[in-house]
A protein has these predicted regions:
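Active-site catalytic pocket residues across diverse enzymes, especially alpha/beta-hydrolases
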Residues: 23-27, 88
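A generic structural signal for alpha->beta connector loops
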Residues: 32-35, 52, 68, 93, ...
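Phosphate-bearing ligand-interacting subdomains
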Residues: 43-105
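Glycine-rich adenosine-cofactor-binding loop
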Residues: 4-23
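NAD(P)-binding Rossmann-fold cofactor-contacting core
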Residues: 26-48
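Short alpha-helical
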Residues: 14-17, 79-80, 195
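Structural signal for interior beta-strand "rungs" in well-ordered beta-sheet cores
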Residues: 98-214
């Protein structure tokens, strides 16, 4: 009988619960994970239940374990997710799970970095590169030869066309689109429903059709 690997989900919020559901969907087809519970640095959540799983403590608990520990960071904010992962770099026992919903359509010519999460209904085509700790939420598409940087968050129903380059820690809002071959600089935020028709070369928040930068 296959031995299940213990898994902790960092982030006991709404997306964390969605990832717990994703884990259950994986296990229904191929038993892989023993979901031990959630990790969250909000002490008010400790010793509570989320989606039937305990919030066992903060991130410092992970470092107290001597055995290899699989975790995945289910925090939507790209920058907060990066801060959490950077905080855990000193813990040699931590291994990052990569979770892909069974409904995802993905070619065998896709490179996926550790700690990434790909949610139900997504399609990733050929010769795509996904960095580490990327979140691709429900019903997204990623076209041929696209490169998605580390810690990128794609919210539901994002469409990224072929040969697009998305920099580290970019957030792509719900329902937005990027036309073929465009580049988005690291740390940019594209608002929900926006359409990127030219390169985004400066950090900032962009909204509209086509998107333009929000000036403070």
């Amino acid at each position: 009988m296959k031995t299940l690997k213990d898994l902790y989900i960092i982030g006991a919020g709404g997306f964390g619960r969605e990832v717990a559901w994703l884990v259950r969907r994986i296990n229904e087809l191929s038993p892989t994970w023993n979901l031990v519970g959630f990790i969250d640095d909000d002490v008010r959540k400790h010793r509570t239940l989320e989606d039937g799983y305990p919030v066992v403590g903060g991130t410092e608990l992970l470092g107290s374990r001597t055995e290899d520990t699989y975790v995945v960071c289910a925090v939507g904010s790209a920058h907060i997710r990066k801060l959490i992962v950077d905080k855990l770099k000193g813990y040699s026992n931590i291994k990052y799970a990569t979770l892909i919903d069974p409904s995802v359509i993905i070619s065998d010519r896709v490179k996926i970095g550790e700690g990434s999460i790909i949610c139900a209904g997504t399609i990733v085509t050929v010769d795509v590169v996904l960095g580490k700790h990327v979140i691709i939420n429900l019903d997204c598409t990623v076209g041929h030869d696209a490169v998605i940087g580390n810690f990128v968050t794609m919210y539901p129903s994002v469409n990224v066309s072929g040969m697009v380059r998305v920099g580290e820690c970019v957030e792509l809002g719900t329902g937005m689109q990027v036309i073929q071959g465009k580049k988005i600089v690291e740390n940019a935020i594209i608002g929900a429903g926006g359409v990127v028709v030219k390169d985004i070369l400066d950090e900032g928040t962009y909204v509209g059709i086509p998107v333009s930068k929000c000036e403070k």
